[in-house]
Amino acid sequence: MRIPAFVLALMLLVLSPAHADPLKVAVFDFELLDTSLQGEVNGPQADEQRRLKDVAEQVRKALAEAGRFVVLDNAPVNAAAHASNLQACGGCDVQYAQQLGADIAITGVVQKVSALILNMNIYLRDTRTGQLVTAMNADFRGNTDDSWSRTASFLLRNRLLAPNYGAPQ
Protein backbone atom coordinates (compact mmCIF):
# COMPACT_ATOMS: atom_id res chain seq x y z
CA MET A 1 0.00 0.00 0.00
CA ARG A 2 1.38 3.39 -0.97
CA ILE A 3 1.00 6.22 1.48
CA PRO A 4 0.36 9.62 -0.16
CA ALA A 5 3.28 12.00 0.33
CA PHE A 6 1.28 14.61 2.25
CA VAL A 7 0.01 11.96 4.71
CA LEU A 8 3.53 10.64 5.23
CA ALA A 9 4.85 14.17 5.74
CA LEU A 10 2.14 14.94 8.28
CA MET A 11 2.78 11.64 10.09
CA LEU A 12 6.45 12.45 10.35
CA LEU A 13 5.64 15.97 11.55
CA VAL A 14 3.15 14.76 14.16
CA LEU A 15 5.21 11.86 15.43
CA SER A 16 8.65 13.46 15.28
CA PRO A 17 10.22 14.24 18.65
CA ALA A 18 11.96 17.19 17.00
CA HIS A 19 8.65 18.95 16.26
CA ALA A 20 9.15 22.44 17.73
CA ASP A 21 5.70 23.31 19.04
CA PRO A 22 3.61 20.66 20.77
CA LEU A 23 0.58 19.73 18.71
CA LYS A 24 -2.81 20.43 20.22
CA VAL A 25 -4.86 17.24 20.37
CA ALA A 26 -8.43 16.43 21.28
CA VAL A 27 -8.63 12.88 22.63
CA PHE A 28 -12.24 11.76 22.68
CA ASP A 29 -13.59 9.02 24.92
CA PHE A 30 -13.32 5.66 23.19
CA GLU A 31 -16.39 3.93 21.79
CA LEU A 32 -17.44 0.29 21.90
CA LEU A 33 -18.47 -1.67 18.84
CA ASP A 34 -19.97 -4.80 20.38
CA THR A 35 -20.50 -7.48 17.74
CA SER A 36 -20.53 -10.31 20.28
CA LEU A 37 -23.47 -12.53 21.10
CA GLN A 38 -23.04 -11.50 24.73
CA GLY A 39 -23.50 -7.86 23.77
CA GLU A 40 -26.58 -8.58 21.71
CA VAL A 41 -28.17 -10.52 24.57
CA ASN A 42 -27.08 -8.38 27.53
CA GLY A 43 -26.62 -4.92 26.02
CA PRO A 44 -24.00 -2.42 27.25
CA GLN A 45 -22.04 -3.42 30.34
CA ALA A 46 -21.13 -0.82 32.98
CA ASP A 47 -17.57 -2.14 33.37
CA GLU A 48 -16.90 -1.86 29.63
CA GLN A 49 -18.34 1.67 29.50
CA ARG A 50 -16.02 2.65 32.35
CA ARG A 51 -13.03 1.05 30.60
CA LEU A 52 -13.71 3.14 27.48
CA LYS A 53 -13.30 6.32 29.54
CA ASP A 54 -10.32 4.88 31.45
CA VAL A 55 -8.44 4.00 28.26
CA ALA A 56 -9.08 7.44 26.76
CA GLU A 57 -7.78 9.01 29.96
CA GLN A 58 -4.71 6.75 29.80
CA VAL A 59 -4.03 8.01 26.26
CA ARG A 60 -4.53 11.64 27.32
CA LYS A 61 -2.14 11.27 30.23
CA ALA A 62 0.56 9.53 28.16
CA LEU A 63 0.40 12.16 25.41
CA ALA A 64 0.58 15.02 27.91
CA GLU A 65 3.54 13.42 29.70
CA ALA A 66 5.36 12.86 26.39
CA GLY A 67 5.76 16.63 26.02
CA ARG A 68 5.04 16.57 22.28
CA PHE A 69 1.34 17.25 22.65
CA VAL A 70 -0.97 19.65 24.41
CA VAL A 71 -4.07 17.68 25.36
CA LEU A 72 -7.10 19.94 25.22
CA ASP A 73 -10.09 19.80 27.55
CA ASN A 74 -13.06 18.26 25.71
CA ALA A 75 -15.69 19.67 28.10
CA PRO A 76 -17.14 22.19 25.59
CA VAL A 77 -17.97 19.41 23.09
CA ASN A 78 -18.35 16.37 25.36
CA ALA A 79 -22.15 16.22 25.21
CA ALA A 80 -22.19 16.42 21.42
CA ALA A 81 -19.34 13.90 21.10
CA HIS A 82 -21.07 11.42 23.40
CA ALA A 83 -24.29 11.78 21.40
CA SER A 84 -22.42 10.98 18.16
CA ASN A 85 -20.93 7.81 16.80
CA LEU A 86 -17.51 9.37 16.21
CA GLN A 87 -16.35 6.47 14.03
CA ALA A 88 -19.17 6.90 11.53
CA CYS A 89 -20.40 10.48 11.76
CA GLY A 90 -18.89 11.86 8.57
CA GLY A 91 -16.13 13.84 10.24
CA CYS A 92 -17.94 15.24 13.28
CA ASP A 93 -14.87 14.29 15.37
CA VAL A 94 -12.82 16.72 13.29
CA GLN A 95 -15.47 19.43 13.65
CA TYR A 96 -15.55 19.00 17.44
CA ALA A 97 -11.74 19.06 17.59
CA GLN A 98 -11.69 22.23 15.46
CA GLN A 99 -14.08 23.89 17.93
CA LEU A 100 -11.53 23.15 20.65
CA GLY A 101 -8.65 24.55 18.58
CA ALA A 102 -6.98 21.16 18.10
CA ASP A 103 -4.54 20.25 15.34
CA ILE A 104 -5.35 16.55 15.64
CA ALA A 105 -8.54 14.66 16.55
CA ILE A 106 -7.89 11.33 18.27
CA THR A 107 -10.66 8.78 18.47
CA GLY A 108 -10.67 5.17 19.51
CA VAL A 109 -12.93 2.20 19.21
CA VAL A 110 -12.81 -1.14 20.94
CA GLN A 111 -14.50 -3.92 19.02
CA LYS A 112 -15.78 -6.74 21.17
CA VAL A 113 -15.83 -9.82 18.95
CA SER A 114 -16.68 -12.24 21.75
CA ALA A 115 -16.52 -12.42 25.53
CA LEU A 116 -12.78 -13.11 25.20
CA ILE A 117 -11.61 -11.54 21.90
CA LEU A 118 -11.38 -7.77 21.48
CA ASN A 119 -9.62 -5.27 19.20
CA MET A 120 -8.52 -1.72 20.06
CA ASN A 121 -8.20 0.90 17.32
CA ILE A 122 -6.85 4.45 17.60
CA TYR A 123 -7.28 7.00 14.80
CA LEU A 124 -5.58 10.39 14.32
CA ARG A 125 -7.12 12.90 11.91
CA ASP A 126 -5.77 16.27 10.80
CA THR A 127 -8.33 18.93 11.70
CA ARG A 128 -7.26 21.19 8.82
CA THR A 129 -7.93 18.62 6.11
CA GLY A 130 -10.05 15.98 7.81
CA GLN A 131 -7.63 13.38 6.46
CA LEU A 132 -6.65 10.32 8.45
CA VAL A 133 -3.06 10.82 9.59
CA THR A 134 -2.55 7.35 10.97
CA ALA A 135 -4.42 4.45 12.49
CA MET A 136 -3.20 1.73 14.79
CA ASN A 137 -4.80 -1.37 16.23
CA ALA A 138 -4.11 -4.38 18.38
CA ASP A 139 -6.06 -7.53 19.13
CA PHE A 140 -6.21 -8.65 22.72
CA ARG A 141 -7.65 -11.43 24.82
CA GLY A 142 -9.50 -11.04 28.07
CA ASN A 143 -12.14 -8.46 28.86
CA THR A 144 -10.51 -7.07 32.00
CA ASP A 145 -9.22 -3.72 33.22
CA ASP A 146 -5.67 -5.04 32.91
CA SER A 147 -6.02 -6.31 29.32
CA TRP A 148 -7.53 -3.04 28.12
CA SER A 149 -4.85 -0.97 29.86
CA ARG A 150 -2.01 -3.17 28.59
CA THR A 151 -3.30 -2.94 25.03
CA ALA A 152 -3.48 0.86 25.21
CA SER A 153 0.05 0.91 26.67
CA PHE A 154 1.29 -1.27 23.82
CA LEU A 155 -0.22 1.03 21.18
CA LEU A 156 1.15 4.12 22.89
CA ARG A 157 4.64 2.73 23.39
CA ASN A 158 5.05 0.89 20.08
CA ARG A 159 3.00 3.03 17.73
CA LEU A 160 1.83 6.49 18.72
CA LEU A 161 4.83 7.52 20.83
CA ALA A 162 7.46 5.30 19.18
CA PRO A 163 10.33 7.48 17.88
CA ASN A 164 10.28 6.18 14.31
CA TYR A 165 6.65 5.14 13.88
CA GLY A 166 5.48 6.08 10.41
CA ALA A 167 9.01 6.71 9.09
CA PRO A 168 9.90 5.06 5.77
CA GLN A 169 11.70 1.76 6.18
Where are each of the predicted segments found?
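Conserved Rossmann-like nucleotide-binding pocket used by diverse enzymes
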Residues: 16, 26, 106
